[in-house]
Amino acid sequence: MTTTPTKKLNESNFGFIHYSSALSHYMDQDFNIAMEVFGILENKYFFGNWGIVESDSIQMNNEAVKNENGGDILGAYILSTGKKIWIKTVGYGIKENQMDLKEYTKEDYNNTCIMFPEDY
């Protein structure tokens, strides 16, 4: 089940963006794959199109976006090569005053990882 993109979400709420080492290696093999992954992030995920996740995940994602309270978001997409990727954001919209920065960094609370499902 997919959602229809509406307006672009606040990119700063997605935090630091990184890739799993396996996906990074896969993208290194073909520039077009890297561009496809970036395109999914920029043109789908950042617009609230969560791809092929279940309806309960869509509901949780939309709730996290609506509340901007540090919720988690998951998107799932199939690349043109047939490989499935996940994009997972931890702490969407968490505010700095909600963070314990004595023990952790902002990146610990708020980050987005693009990966293969088996990397999770």
Please provide the spans of the model-predicted regions.
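Short, compact, well-ordered microdomains
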Residues: 64, 69-120
